[in-house]
C-alpha cells in the first residue's frame, strides 16, 4: 500500500449520528490490518482529535478552511500523508453544513472536494427501513459533483434489518452499502456542557475499543472501503513563507500541558519547533516552578474544573507573575486567559484567585457566551498581530471575561456576507497577550514572527 495513498471522509447526516465513535472504531480496525493511519478532523474541534490520538496513538490534525487558505491546508494534509497509508477524516456536523447557507464553504462536502477524497456517509438505521434510501438519495443528489462513494449504517440491531436497509439503498441510490454498526454501549463517549469529555480526562478503556474494532471487522467490508478510498493524487499545496529554523534559535517555550490546559493544534507546535524553538512542557496544576524560558503558551482547556487547585498552587502563580514582569512573551487562549485574569468564578459561584496578570474577572455561565468563527483586527500592537492585521479563529466558551483594561482587538462575525456581531476582545499587558480566540498559526507567517521577535527582546 505504500505506493498509493488512501483517504476517505466519514460524513454524517448531522451532529450526534455517531461519526466520532465509528471513526475511532475504524482507526483501530485499520491499524489491526497493519496500516499506518493518519486521523484528521474537519473544522476546529479539539475534543474529537484528542480521542483520535488516544485511540490510535497518532496525533490527529485539524483541517479548517475558515482559518487556513486552501494551498496551506492542502500542504499540511500532504505533509502528514508522507508517512501514512490511509487518512481517516472525520467530518463536522452534517455533510453539507458549513459556515452559513453555502454548502461549499467550510463544510465537510467542500473539504472532500478540495482534497479529492471520497465520502462515506454514515446514516442512522434505527427504527427505519426503505425511508432511509430517501435520506441517502437526498444527500446524493444535493450535490452531484461530490464523490459520495458509499454508505455505512449505524445503530442496526440485526443482520435481517441490515439486509433490508442495504437492499433499499443499493436499489434506489445505486450506492454500495459497506456495512453496519451495531449498538455498542461499551464505547459510548462521555459528554458534558462543551461536548465530549476529553480523552485525557476519561480513562480510555483500550480493550473496549479493541473489541469494538473486532465487531466492525465482522460487520463492515473493509476491503471494499479500501478499494473506494484510493486517491488518484494528493492535492496541490503550497506553504507561504515560514520562519526558518534559525528564527527561534536560542528560544525556549514553556507549554502548559495538563488536565486544565491541553487544547493545542499539533501543526502549531510543529511550526514553532521548525522555527528552532525548544519546547518544554509544564503543568500549572502540579509543577512548582516554570522552566527557564523566553516564551510561555497557556492553551485552552477547562481551568474552571480545576480552579481551586490552580489557585492553591500559589508558587506557580508567583512564578508566572515574575515571568510577566521580566518581559517573557506570554500568549494565552481561552482557558489560558481565564487563568491569567485576576479571579475566576466557577459554576457554583465560588471565586478563586488567579494570576492577576490580565486585570479582570472570569465568570462561568450556563449558556454559551460566544460560539463560532470570527475575525479579529488588531487596533494596536499585540503579541501576534500589528495594528490593522487580521487574525482568523474561533471561540467556544461558557465563561465571560469582565476586563478592567480596554481590549486591543476589534472582532466581528460575518456570515453569508452580513456582519452578525461586532465586539472587542483580546488584552495586551506588557509582553503578554490573551484572548478567547483559538488560532492556527499557519494562516499568517507574520503571527509567529511577531511572537518570536517579542521573545527575543528578553534574551
Curated annotation (Swiss-Prot):
The record marks 438 as: Increases nucleophilicity of active site Cys. It comes from the Bacteria. Its EC number is 6.3.5.11. GO terms for biological process: cobalamin biosynthetic process. CDD domains: CobB_N (cd05388), GATase1_CobB (cd03130). It catalyses: cob(II)yrinate + 2 L-glutamine + 2 ATP + 2 H2O = cob(II)yrinate a,c diamide + 2 L-glutamate + 2 ADP + 2 phosphate + 2 H(+). The active site is at residue 334. The catalytic activity is essentially constant between pH 6.8 and 8.0. Pathway: Cofactor biosynthesis; adenosylcobalamin biosynthesis; cob(II)yrinate a,c-diamide from sirohydrochlorin (anaerobic route): step 10/10. Belongs to the CobB/CbiA family. The a and c carboxylates of cobyrinate are activated for nucleophilic attack via formation of a phosphorylated intermediate by ATP. CbiA catalyzes first the amidation of the c-carboxylate, and then that of the a-carboxylate. Catalyzes the ATP-dependent amidation of the two carboxylate groups at positions a and c of cobyrinate, using either L-glutamine or ammonia as the nitrogen source. Is able to use other nucleotide triphosphates as substrate, such as GTP or UTP, although less efficiently than ATP. Comprises of two domains. The C-terminal domain contains the binding site for glutamine and catalyzes the hydrolysis of this substrate to glutamate and ammonia. The N-terminal domain is anticipated to bind ATP and cobyrinate and catalyzes the ultimate synthesis of the diamide product. The ammonia produced via the glutaminase domain is probably translocated to the adjacent domain via a molecular tunnel, where it reacts with an activated intermediate. This is Cobyrinate a,c-diamide synthase. It comes from Salmonella typhimurium (strain LT2 / SGSC1412 / ATCC 700720). The lineage of its organism: Bacteria, Pseudomonadati, Pseudomonadota, Gammaproteobacteria, Enterobacterales. The gene is cbiA.
